[in-house]
């Protein structure tokens, strides 16, 4: 990589860090309104759809970990809201990064299931779902695992082979992460789910779908 390109990449990374850092600035108290709060001495971060963008995920996590180190909250919670895979170029890298983070002792990490994880997991056991999944972003996910996805009109045997290869490519850490996914989680006054909640229905009675 030439020096000018390296400098450009460094500047872009710094711009990303500055932009993300602004998100952590404390907002003024809007007097007269009830403020939703986390449990005492608990800081919660929530990260939405990552969609295979491992590079941006790493930048964001670096800022969060720096914030944890600087403020030392009694409890630091990180909630991922689902849709880790598909569309972006590096679904495998995202899963690898999340697996590494789940072993981090200073942060309580929670993974929620998104519809894209459901699509991928469906393909693992039902290969004929492959064409629909690939139109939905699964093509890029398969590519990140080194799997060349078949085309929509290809014989079922090719989709079965792609499903088998993905099953073999997912290591035990990936499977443990996928198995740990929840439909929702709550901390204090905050309720987290991938696609929101049905208005008028108590949270305890929400349909996970």
Map each language-model feature to its residues.
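Feature recognizes metal-dependent phosphohydrolase scaffolds
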Residues: 2-209
């Amino acid at each position: 990589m030439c020096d000018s390109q390296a400098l450009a990449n460094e500047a872009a990374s710094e711009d990303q860090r500055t932009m993300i850092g602004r998100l952590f600035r404390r907002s003024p108290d809007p007097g007269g309104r009830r403020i939703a709060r986390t449990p005492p001495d608990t800081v919660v971060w929530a990260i939405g759809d990552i969609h295979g963008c491992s590079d941006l995920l790493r930048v964001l996590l670096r800022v969060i970990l720096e914030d944890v180190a600087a403020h030392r909250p009694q409890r630091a919670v990180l909630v991922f809201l689902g849709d880790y895979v598909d569309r972006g170029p590096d679904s495998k890298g995202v899963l690898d990064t999340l697996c590494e983070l789940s072993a981090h002792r200073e942060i309580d990490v929670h993974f929620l299931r998104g519809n894209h994880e459901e699509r991928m997991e469906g393909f693992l056991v039902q290969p004929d779902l492959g064409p629909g999944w690939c139109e939905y972003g699964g093509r890029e996910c398969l590519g990140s695992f080194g799997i060349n996805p078949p085309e929509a009109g290809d014989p079922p045997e090719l989709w079965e082979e792609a499903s088998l290869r993905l099953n073999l490519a997912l290591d035990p850490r990936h499977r443990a992460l996928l198995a740990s996914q929840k439909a929702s989680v709550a901390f204090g006054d905050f309720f987290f789910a991938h696609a929101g909640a049905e208005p008028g229905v108590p949270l305890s009675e929400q349909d996970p779908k």
